[in-house]
Amino acid sequence: DTVEDVRKGLPSASAFGRLALCPGSFTMEKSCPDESSEAAAEGTLLHRYMEYLLLKDDAAEEGMEFSWHDFLNSREYESAELNHEQVELCGRALRLLNGVKEKILDYPDAFFSLVSTEERRFLSDWIEGGEYSGQWDALFRVGSDLLVLDWKFGRVAVDSAEANRQLEALVPLAAQKANEEGIIYNGIYAAIIQPRVAGPASVTFYDDEAISQAEQDSLAVARAAMDPDAP
């Protein structure tokens, strides 16, 4: 499927940092085909490998195992290999994730489990208007909370978790999934892991009030972007 098909022609959380500043860029973006680049291709490969590592660890707890190529075949992805630097980079990403766990868990043996990976969801406001989609890289249950996670493999630091519009838009989608599936949670942590950027992962926390505000703010961004007269 093309990006347009997957997103159903709606604004996507990954662009919310830009759309919040320039709503009209959504219409311009739709009229211009996506340009592939070496960096984008590497980003896709690294995201797939991280998904594989998370699912592999999850399966190992159930006594199952599968290879990288088994994973690629199951997703109908083209065969691909990582070089040594890329494998090391993904290892660093996992270590940064462990740092996030240690930061937010009250005690070492607290409940931590994978809920889903690379899941795209949609959120709509049928009263005020506005609709968007977003895809997290991973969603976890962490003790009595949730953790929504985004990997960034670029060499330039992105906005901190607290100021990140993409994460802000993903949080209501995580809450939506939890509510639909009966997952009880007190709040939602949101984290950005950037293994090519120095320092620990960036983490923030949303309580119920902040989750509701994030939903309103994100739908407002989508609403403005979908306005045909947006500047």
Per-segment meaning from a language model:
Residues A20-F26, A224-P231:
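Cysteine-cluster motifs in flexible loop/terminal segments that predominantly coordinate metals
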Residues D1-D145, G187-Y189:
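Metal-dependent nuclease catalytic cores that hydrolyze phosphodiester bonds in DNA/RNA
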Residues A110-D229:
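Mg2+/Mn2+-dependent nuclease catalytic core
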